[in-house]
């Protein structure tokens, strides 16, 4: 096969922003997907906090990927889309079942915390009025904010964003960069 990306060496520190800039097709998205573990590099290492994650599943890398296509669940409301990563992370297998989960005492306090985290992110992104809607009822910019929120709510070690602010109004773009 043909090599798409050569000689990439990134060292990013806490609180630092790094932007990959280049023409369409030069490998920016592929680089992000390799870091996230969604694609495998043919050589070299991907390390996070000095630890190689080459053999680490994407779900265990503590990274949040925001795709240009949003990747929202169309059958879920905005609230449910925001809650999904927290439910997967914080609830046990049995607590995730709607009927059975309600019988488990530990589920209630976890769900209260999940709701708080969703509320904080929805306020930050100004999407509270959208929480009961489904993605198909939203504009492109609104969907993008929901996708950002789903990444933010997890509070990951790092965000990998593939053109995350491209569909937003200039004032909201500035607000989110500051956040």
Describe the function of each predicted region.
Residues 36:
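Helix-to-loop junction immediately C-terminal to a conserved catalytic motif
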Residues 153-157:
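A short, proline-enriched helix->beta-strand linker immediately N-terminal to the Walker B motif
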Residues 134-138, 142:
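Conserved ABC ATPase signature
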Residues 148:
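Hydrophobic anchor residue at the start of the ABC signature
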Residues 52-54, 83, 87-129:
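Conserved ABC ATPase "signature" region
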